[in-house]
Regions:
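ADP-ribose/NAD+-binding catalytic cleft of ART/PARP-like enzymes
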Residues: 1-41, 55, 166-168
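Conserved NAD+-utilizing ADP-ribose enzyme module
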Residues: 32-38, 46-168
Length: 168
């Protein structure tokens, strides 16, 4: 499995309406699939520990602790829609141990069609509460504290705004 952060599940679940009789998905959801160099960042997430590792990495790339939403993507399903996964670039999250950063992946060689197929796939996933989740600020903060206490985060290397928000 792979984990992909999104801005909000409400963009995907149909609760945000578009005043068109032919509306398919709210346009804001597409911004969750913004690529760089035709790639989309994801994290390896085969276990609950992997999921937590990814969430911590994503949280460490922010200026403050805030809610976080994500989808869990099945690699076999991505293969069916001809989306390839690369492990060539390590992840980046200031202060996080390399053993976690090595779980970073990229969906690569994305084009208009692959993004469309990925959108359709994610619209199916949103119907399954096991495949998508919203985490509260409190849950994110508790996870960051847990990783700090396990010495998996080097506080001195963290983003100063995030450290200030956490009062570390």
């Amino acid at each position: 499995m792979l984990i992909r952060m999104i801005s909000s599940i409400s963009r995907w679940d149909g609760s945000r309406s578009v005043n068109r009789k032919d509306a398919f998905i709210c346009g804001d959801a597409i911004s969750d699939l913004r690529t760089t160099n035709n790639e989309l960042r994801v994290w390896k997430a085969d276990t609950q520990e992997d999921i937590e590792d990814a969430i911590v990495a994503l949280a460490l790339n922010r200026d403050s602790v805030s809610k976080l939403s994500y989808f869990l993507l099945e690699e076999d399903e991505l293969k069916k829609i001809e989306i390839d996964v690369s492990d060539q670039k390590p992840g980046a999250a200031a202060g996080l141990k390399d053993c976690i950063l090595s779980k970073h992946r990229d969906l690569i060689e994305l084009d208009f069609w692959r993004l469309g197929f990925l959108t359709q796939y994610m619209l199916e996933l949103v119907k399954n509460p096991k495949q998508c989740k919203n985490l509260t600020r409190k849950e994110i903060k508790a996870l960051l504290e847990k990783y700090k206490n396990k010495n998996l985060i080097t506080v001195e290397q963290m983003n100063s705004k995030l450290k200030e928000d956490l009062k570390w």
